[in-house]
Amino acid sequence: MAGIESKQRRAQKKAAKAAMKEKKNKESNESSTSVEALNEKEMINTIKSPIIETADTADQENESEGSDEVELSDLEGIELEEDADLIRKRKLAINNTVALENIYERIKYPDDISFVENQAVTTKEPIIIENVEDDLARELAFYKQGVSSVKAAFAKLREANVLISRPHDYFAEMLKSDDHMEKVRQELIKEATAKKLSQQAKKQRELKKFGKQVQLAKQEERQREKKETLEKINLLKRKHTGGDLTTEDDFDIALSSASADTFKKGSRSTKSRPQPNPKRQKKNEKYGFGGPKHRSKSNDLDSLAATEFGRKGLKNIKSKKRPGKARREKARK
């Protein structure tokens, strides 16, 4: 029973504090309406005082909530006063237009000052937004207001003969010195050069890798051709020697003729020799060969073959046979 009574007392204290809070809020609202009759300094003080009071009440409320926290499980089975659980926190909002207008009149520019000095533009129509919670619509309204204000300001500045655009030949001194910008330029050039060199090195590595692949493929192709050529030669040898050839060893006649033409005597050497210039040949036939003449009267292979001492002439000359022993003895006597 003692626990239930303590819980009831706590709940009653909480309800009493909430009632005191509502009473203070009503008093602050009544005090804000009476600000119109006060002077300017009193108005400012009245603006500050409710804020301080609300801060104090908020601190007191936080302290009271911290000290008198009651769990929901403890309040079960207790009959509270009517509307005790409907107490909610409410922020105090003050919109004292009279004080704000008085302050504005005090700090605003005088009417006789020129537009060039203050450059203050006030829109003719207020901003009207259907849904103030829509961020896009709100920002669009601010943008339109700014554009219209800038256009109005440009018109007033043109009337006052004030230049509002930069000339085409305007030379603006840079914030950084020339030495600093030269260092920046050198650094940018260095970075660009390093990037270019890295790209070139990467490209060379790729080409080298591709070149190795091509070289290996070429070597494999040469080995395969060499193997095929040796097989063809062996088959041709067996064919010419009269060896037994099976159907598996046969190959096309065109292939054998091609291999025979390939291995003709002197066929490779004639192709590899450089051919004489036809223009040079014509001149040699017309004017003769302009080379050395000191051996022009010496015999060569063709001239020697034309005589009896040539290879053909010597073949016709038969050597005398050696006489027999009886003839040799007879000749000695």
From Swiss-Prot:
Entry keyword set:
Coiled coil, Nucleus, Phosphoprotein, Ribosome biogenesis
Q: Which residues carry this modification: Phosphoserine?
A: S272
Kindly list the biological process annotations in GO that this record carries.
ribosomal large subunit biogenesis; rRNA processing
**Pfam families per record:** Ebp2
Give the compositionally biased regions (Acidic residues). 56-75
Q: Which residues form a coiled coil?
A: 212-240
One GO CC annotation: nucleus
Question: Compositionally biased, Basic and acidic residues: which spans?
Answer: 19-29, 218-227
Please note every region of biased composition (Basic residues): 312-333
The residue ranges crossing the membrane are none
Record's subunit section: Interacts with sad1.
As for family, the record states: Belongs to the EBP2 family.
Q: What is this protein called?
A: Probable rRNA-processing protein ebp2
